[in-house]
Structure formats: C-alpha cells, structure tokens
C-alpha cells in the first residue's frame, strides 16, 4: 500500500489507518466527532498528500486547459483558483478538481487520489496537439489547515512577513513562497488553507502546526465536514456515468464563450436541451436513524430517488445526505430496517462557517 510522507507521524499518533484508493490513510486519531467539531470550532489539520498536484506549463497551457476543462480558465487572474469538472466526450465527469493559475503559461491542477493515474493519462492523451508540458509533482506533500482559527495557527509557524501575506489571501487565492504554495481553499465549509510543499519539509511543518494549537483530523471527519458543506465526493456523488447537470454542478460549466470548444461540450448541450428529470438535493432525516449511500427515497407517486452520500451530522445532530430525486414528487420517505421514515428535502448545503443553513 502507498504511504504519504506523514505515515510515521500518523502511526505515532495512534491513528486508525485504512486503505483509501490504495493509500494507507488515517480515518481518525481516536474520536471522529471530536475531530469534526474541532475543525468547526478551532483548527484541524489533514494530511491530503494522497492527492496529486500536476503542473501544466507551456505557451499553450491556457489554450489546452480551455479545451480540457468545462469551466473556463480564461476567466482566471494570476494567483487565483477555480473549481471545475473535467468531462469525457459524453459529458460524463472524469474528475472534479481545482485549477490554480500561476502565470499565463503555468497552471497547477490538484486531482483526486483515486484518479491520479487516470487523470494524468487523460491529460497526456488530450495534450498531443498543444505546446504544453505535463509534470506530476510526486515529490510534493499537501496539508489542509482548516477551521476558524486556521489563520491564527498558521501565523504562528511562519515568519511575520509571510504571515501578513497569508492572512491577506482571499478565498480561492494563493501565493508561492519559494517552493511552498499556500491557497485559501478547502473541503470543509470553514476558513482555511491548503499548503503544497516539498515532501522533505512536511513533517517539520506538521509538527509545528501541532505544537501551535492545531489538532490532527482524519478522513472520517473530512467526509462529514464536506458532506455538511454540500461538497461532492468523486466516485460517490458523481462519476463518468453522470453529467454536471444531474449533480447540481451546471454552474461550473462555462458556456459564455460560444466559440470555445471543450471536451464534452456537444454532449453537454444535447443533455441540456433534452432536460434532466432529476434534481440534486440535500436530505434531512426527521427522526433517529442513519442515512447511507445507496438508500432509496420513495415518493407517494411511486417514483424513487437515491442517496449518494449520507452520514450523521455532528454539527446539526441529525442524519443528512446528498441525493438525486424526481423533479416532481411529494412526501419522501426512506426505508431503514423495515420502517418508513420521513425525510425533508432541502438545498444541498447544510453548514457554512459553523452555522446551520437549514
């Protein structure tokens, strides 16, 4: 099994390790709920070095990414980041990712752990007619520093000058400090940063964060945090069999430049014209119980919906989920252990900055 540069640190902290996309990763360090709450109230740190930073460089870097991605990187200013989907020719989602613009001729993309090899292969397959170099940065590590006290913690472990610049970063902005890249991005619904740095330096950084008030958090808390924030998990909430239209991600497909071609555009327009007969929603269980991926939601007209992600919400103290359901249907229920339990359909975002949105 693959190991991140922080593997020994996790073992020393008595983390419970699990296989995640072929990587040995910490699911928790004791109490998943405590780790979750700490990110909502204080500062938690995550090892996400199983994800991969890929640099796209060359005179046609922007032209290539305008073709490769459904969102339009031409909108990006330097030192800004953008969320978007990478589609196949049927408009199915190959991956969702964040693209960072360093210069007109240098972009960085961070891809999901389970798609590292397939994404890089897809980049290379589609780059043949463009003047670009594609470089997977396998010698880098990634640490997410998340929570309302993330700024305070990170300021304690860097120089005063760098602290001032980091604090000034706006959401979806980033800055390089030598070989370190600090971005005001995250996957928790809280303020925070994702720090991409040389793998040889990550243990010292991790230890400094812990010494200055941060607590480690595992993939279990990461999942409940992103679920509360209404953020998609690739492979659970969407994959190549789904288009952005069916998963509430149409906003991330930029159609403003009618002359721009991108992979999947023709199929996406056809799907858009045909219309989608489901909608993307949040689900809240009105009684005790647990919502899980794969559960059916039944409606009184006989139609069904399906939960793609579900869990107990430590912040809201109820079970929540993300689901696709028929556009017109009433009185939703889920069947749990032979009982029909009422659920409420809400907007697919439950918590932001520690506050309930439902």
Curated annotation (Swiss-Prot):
Keyword terms: Aminotransferase, Transferase
* Gene Ontology biological process terms from the UniProt entry: glycine decarboxylation via glycine cleavage system
Range of residues in the leader sequence? none
The Gene Ontology CC terms held by the record are:
cytosol; glycine cleavage complex
Q: What class of enzyme is it?
A: transferase
Q: Which GO terms describe its molecular function?
A: aminomethyltransferase activity; transaminase activity
Which superkingdom is the protein from?
Answer: Bacteria
Chemical reaction(s) catalysed: N(6)-[(R)-S(8)-aminomethyldihydrolipoyl]-L-lysyl-[protein] + (6S)-5,6,7,8-tetrahydrofolate = N(6)-[(R)-dihydrolipoyl]-L-lysyl-[protein] + (6R)-5,10-methylene-5,6,7,8-tetrahydrofolate + NH4(+)
Q: What is its EC number?
A: 2.1.2.10
What are the cysteine partners in each disulfide bond? Answer: none
Q: What does this protein do?
A: The glycine cleavage system catalyzes the degradation of glycine.
Subunit note: The glycine cleavage system is composed of four proteins: P, T, L and H.
Task: Please state which protein family the record places this protein in.
Answer: Belongs to the GcvT family.
Protein name, entry field: Aminomethyltransferase
């Amino acid at each position: 099994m693959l190991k991140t540069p922080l593997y020994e640190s996790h073992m020393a902290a008595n983390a419970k390790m699990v296989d995640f996309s072929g990587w040995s990763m910490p699911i928790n360090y004791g109490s998943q709920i405590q780790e979750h709450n700490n990110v909502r109230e204080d500062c938690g740190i995550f090892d996400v070095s199983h994800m991969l930073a890929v640099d796209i460089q060359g005179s046609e870097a922007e032209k290539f990414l305008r073709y490769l991605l459904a969102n339009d990187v031409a909108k990006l200013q330097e030192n800004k980041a953008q969320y978007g989907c990478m589609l196949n020719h049927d408009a199915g989602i190959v991956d969702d990712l964040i693209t960072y613009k360093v210069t007109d001729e240098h972009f960085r993309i961070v891809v999901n752990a389970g798609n590292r090899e397939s994404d890089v292969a897809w980049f290379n397959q589609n780059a043949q007619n463009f003047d670009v170099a594609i470089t997977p940065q396998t010698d880098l590590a990634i640490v997410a520093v998340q929570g309302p006290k993330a700024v305070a913690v990170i300021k304690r472990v860097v120089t005063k000058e760098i602290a001032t610049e980091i604090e000034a970063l706006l959401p979806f902005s980033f800055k390089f400090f030598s070989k370190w890249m600090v971005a005001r991005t995250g996957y928790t619904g809280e303020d925070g940063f994702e720090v991409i740095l040389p793998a040889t330096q990550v243990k010292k950084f991790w230890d400094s964060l812990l010494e200055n008030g941060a607590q480690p958090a595992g993939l279990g808390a990461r999942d409940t945090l992103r679920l509360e924030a209404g953020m998609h998990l690739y492979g659970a909430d969407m994959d190549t069999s789904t288009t952005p239209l069916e998963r509430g991600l149409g906003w991330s497909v930029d159609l403003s430049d009618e002359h721009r071609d991108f992979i999947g555009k023709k199929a996406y327009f056809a799907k858009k014209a045909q219309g989608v007969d489901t909608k993307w929603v949040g689900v809240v269980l009105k009684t005790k119980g647990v919502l899980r991926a794969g559960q059916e939601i039944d409606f009184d007209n006989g139609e069904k919906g399906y939960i793609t992600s579900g869990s107990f919400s430590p912040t809201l103290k109820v079970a929540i989920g993300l689901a696709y359901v028929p556009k017109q249907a009433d009185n939703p229920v889920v069947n749990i252990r032979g009982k029909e339990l009422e659920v409420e359909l809400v907007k697919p975002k439950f918590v932001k900055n520690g506050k309930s949105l439902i």
